């Protein structure tokens, strides 16, 4: 399975094309729209979420609610484009109109300046439009298709926030993936500890009042993963490496860890390695899950536990200093719409990206022209592993 996304933040629409999805997978626009709605939620979201109400249109690859095995095309209209038709016109316009909403003052922390240098733009809006987090709309749409596929083979994906700015959420131990999903869904800030809800919301309110932004750490957990996805035979076949690349590709993500993660650098080997157990009922299992579900770049049957760190949103209502690319004079950076935090939405994006990487790996390992063929292959593999 592979996919491409296209579209600009203020363009007419966003598009994704997905190739390699098995025939016979039940898929509806309503299912995808429910995931898109999750991305637009969360405490602290700003004006654009009131403007946009994302609705997907499926224009190929699905007939009568079932995938057909061909490329699936997904489109989401940008309702905000109505105000930007001349500014974002694909056709040539006169010089006066070209100058409308021109950006020459790059914002620190964004792709504006480096994009202008790389692609030789004199209007940094060209960098802003494609590098915008608006693109993650289609990552979530693609991820919805991936999650729909994973559901069919008993794989469940959930995400929640474990650190909000400088505040660590005290996460209860031994929550199942289903419990994490349920608790996070009930929280406006996507946390699984309701005792911290009001504290976090008050913190976000204060950050907004200060004209600042915060980042944090998001954890995605995946249960029911078949053993042996990924491989140790080449560096680029290791599944944890593929997931790491996917997570860090999300706007504003700066780091990733699995299981105990960077804490492993402070612990002894005897405290980190997961002891192997066996029972007639369950086959091989692990006593702990410090390695986050991976050994040798392969899934080991334990839940996948991956965390990504998101930097604060770089657009500030108290803008930092920058330099105009035309005059080279210092200036306060251009202010675009911004939120004090996008952590809950970013959690949905991360969850979607991880699901997409996993679905791609599942389809690479197992026969999958048709959904029933895939389900049969996965079931036979699970039985073999259990009896190993």
Curated annotation (Swiss-Prot):
Cofactor(s) essential for the protein: FMNH2
Major enzyme class: lyase
Catalysed reaction, written as an equation: 5-O-(1-carboxyvinyl)-3-phosphoshikimate = chorismate + phosphate
GO cellular component, one term: cytosol
NAD is among the record's keywords: no
Keyword Electron transport: no
Recorded metabolic or biological pathway in which this protein acts: Metabolic intermediate biosynthesis; chorismate biosynthesis; chorismate from D-erythrose 4-phosphate and phosphoenolpyruvate: step 7/7
CDD domains according to UniProt: Chorismate_synthase
One Pfam family in the UniProt entry: Chorismate_synt
UniProt similarity note: Belongs to the chorismate synthase family.
Function: This reaction introduces a second double bond into the aromatic ring system.
Protein name: Chorismate synthase
Species this chain originates from: Streptococcus sanguinis (strain SK36)
Gene that produces this protein: aroC
């Amino acid at each position: 399975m592979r996919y491409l996304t296209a579209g600009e933040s203020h363009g007419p629409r966003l598009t994704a094309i997905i190739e390699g999805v098995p025939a016979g997978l039940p898929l509806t626009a309503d299912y995808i729209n429910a995931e898109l709605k999750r991305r637009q939620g969360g405490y602290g979201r700003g004006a654009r979420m009131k403007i946009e109400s994302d609705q997907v249109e499926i224009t190929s690859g699905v007939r009568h609610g079932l995938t057909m095995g061909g490329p699936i095309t997904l489109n989401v209209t940008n309702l905000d484009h109505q105000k930007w038709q001349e500014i974002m016109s694909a056709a040539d316009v006169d010089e006066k109109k070209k100058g409308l909403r021109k950006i020459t003052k790059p914002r620190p922390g964004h792709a504006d300046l480096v994009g202008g240098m790389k692609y030789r733009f004199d209007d940094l809006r060209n960098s802003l439009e494609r590098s915008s987090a608006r693109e993650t709309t289609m990552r979530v749409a693609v991820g919805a298709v991936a999650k729909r596929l994973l559901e069919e083979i008993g794989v469940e994906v959930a995400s929640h926030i474990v650190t909000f700015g400088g505040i660590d959420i005290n996460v209860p131990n031994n929550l199942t993936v289903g419990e994490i999903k349920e608790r996070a869904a009930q929280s406006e800030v996507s946390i699984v500890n309701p005792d911290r809800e009001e504290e976090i919301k008050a913190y976000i309110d204060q950050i907004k009042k200060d004209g600042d932004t915060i980042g944090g750490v998001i954890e995605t957990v995946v249960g029911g993963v078949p053993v042996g996805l990924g491989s140790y035979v080449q560096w680029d076949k290791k599944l944890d490496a593929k997931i790491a690349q996917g997570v860090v590709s999300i706007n504003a993500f700066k780091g990733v860890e699995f299981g105990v993660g960077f804490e492993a650098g402070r612990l002894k080997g005897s405290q980190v390695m997961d002891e192997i157990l066996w029972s007639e009922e369950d086959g091989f299992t692990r006593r702990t899950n410090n390695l986050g579900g991976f050994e040798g770049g392969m899934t080991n049957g334990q839940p996948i536990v991956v965390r990504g760190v998101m930097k604060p949103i770089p657009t500030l209502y108290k803008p930092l200093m920058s330099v105009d690319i035309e005059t080279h004079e210092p200036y306060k950076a251009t202010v675009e719409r911004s939120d004090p935090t996008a952590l809950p939405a970013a959690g949905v994006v991360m969850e979607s990206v991880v699901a997409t990487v996993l679905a791609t790996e599942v389809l690479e390992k197992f026969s999958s022209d048709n959904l029933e063929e895939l389900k049969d292959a996965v079931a036979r593999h699970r039985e073999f592993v259990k009896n190993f």
